[in-house]
Amino acid sequence: MKKTLILLTAICMVAISRGQNLAKVTITDMGNIEKLSFGLRENVLLNISKDGNIMDWGVDRYAGRLQESKPGVLDPYQGRVEYYTESDNEAFRGKVKSIGGIFITYYPSSAEDGFAGKVKTVGPNKFDYYKTVENEAFRGNIKSAGQTTFTWYSSYDNEAYSGKPKSIGSSNITYYSNFDDQAFRGKLKSLGGQTFTYYSSTDLKDYRGRPKNGMQFQFINGIKYQFKY
């Protein structure tokens, strides 16, 4: 009986952890991450910036579906939401504390490396960031969120993609360099198994730099991506 309870508890913890993993990435064709969306209970999405600040949250009306007729629109969440009070640490007083029973913590004002005020945990998932001593192109950016890791191109890389995401989880990301056609240099070239091509500077003016292929929404290695062209 005891072993059964332990097993059930472990299964529940895994299910809860997976429920707050990275669900969606909104990224432009130039490789700029606009927001990272984490799934909570009741189809709630929590949007966090690449440097660990909460942007907004709400109910995902397109949960489980690939296409979105109104991309990025969240419906108001009617459940219980709590906030930190004025008596809490100055780095997170007034910030959201829990959404639908999922608790959110932040790094306190005493945290080093510029972490103060950034999201520290969402449910059981811990967030980590690149420290101030690391490369200037990505210091302060998110390093890991739960089981998902993030790497970034450094200031030593080609300037067309310096500071842009290099990998998200198991998906590697490449870009067109400064040596490529001016109409698409710096734009996404590949993400995971998906490749991107664009009209060049020799094409009709209205087409230059526009994508030749690639859907606006795609599931890649378990994460939904919204590409903004």
Regions found by a protein language model. Give the residues of each.
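Repetitive, compositionally biased segments used for assembly/scaffolding
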Residues: K24-Y229
